[in-house]
Amino acid sequence: MSVANPLRKSIKCVILDLDGTLLNTDGIVCNVLKVSLGKYGKEWDGRETLQIAGKTPFEAASAVVEDYGLPCSPIEFISEISPLFSDQWCNIKALPGANRLIKHLKSNGVPMVLASNSPRESIDAKISFHDGWKDSFSVIIGGDEVRTAKPSPDIFFEAARRLCMEPSSCLVIEDSLPGVTAGKAAEMEVVAVPSLPKQSHLFTAADEVINSLLDLQLEKWGLPPFTDWVEGTLPVDPWYIGGPVIKGFGRGSKVLGIPTANLSTKDYSDLLSEHPAGVYFGWAGLSARGIFKMVMSIGWNPYFSNKEKTIEPWLLHEFSEDFYGEELRLVIVGYIRPEENFPSLESLIAKIHEDRRVAERALDLPMYSSHKNDAYLRSS
């Protein structure tokens, strides 16, 4: 990840993209395209995901129609899928850190603009399901309200004009390449939060690339810093996952000396897609053994080049025997850091043990220790 030089410019406002930056739209898009392409005897395989990210609805529809050889025009395809999308807007969840960021900037009097390639009507419909969002933005601009959509800088110039601010005093937060390109063309500072996995290397034009909004450090840009980090940890809304313990890759104990208790992701792929890759912690309940402190990684483990997103919890207790097949319940209550690659196995192991120490200390704090009594941990 690239790192911004602290306080390079005095930032006075923040311009945010919507889909993929604040809202987890990707899953809805995939589901709608699976249904729509199925009607034509086609199967959505995700190959257009990068090409359509950040594009206008017409551009995205054109790419899908051409690539899959559909017997319809882009306009006709949009007419077919628009009702399907409208039915799903109520189900789109805010991405981790989105509500936190909006509330923090609003409470500190930092003007915010919502600037999306989506039509204005679509933007209003989506954010109507998220309390307080509409009133938090000083300006909302849709792609149909400017002459040329991103990657043209028009939408960002318009945002600065409506706020009566110089473009150089604006910080753009974007998840897609068109958005980053547009922000830099407007001579604004740009933080990229890639919504697609393993694509950070494509965002070299951005001033900073971060893993998720949870990792945003506003003080780098002269903005009021977050104050909710506690002893190297960030509290998150608790989330839950469980199932029988399965055999993993066999490298936890043998290669790393760290015995992880692996869970199948088959039934939790949608849940895992909602959470950024990184290191989390919380409590683990084993049906026949009790409740234990836990630290875990979510992601692709770049050192080992995993092909699929996995979850690998480490129960912070010495067990005398394996417990494959036993029911394991996890309550995740905090975040430590983003996923990262390491130059050596030794540095990876050292970092994992540091994560353990951070988690063990944090879980003694009342704000985290209270979750040890969560009924989910004792369910079977």
Feature locations, PLM:
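Helix-loop "lid/cap" segments that line or gate small-molecule binding pockets
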Residues: 36-37, 56-71, 126, 160
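Short helix-capping segments at alpha-helix termini
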Residues: 39-42, 68-72, 131-136, 164-165
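Substrate-recognition element of Asp-dependent hydrolases with the DxDx(T/V) motif
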Residues: 21, 33, 80, 98-128, ...
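Active-site neighborhood of HAD-like aspartate-dependent phosphohydrolases
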Residues: 2-50
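Metal-dependent phosphoesterase signature
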Residues: 43, 63-100, 108
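Asp-based, Mg2+/Mn2+-dependent phosphohydrolase catalytic module
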Residues: 1-12, 103, 119-236
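Short beta->alpha linker loops
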Residues: 28, 52-56, 80, 93-97, ...
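Phosphate/ribose-recognition catalytic cores of enzymes acting on nucleotide-derived substrates
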Residues: 239-380
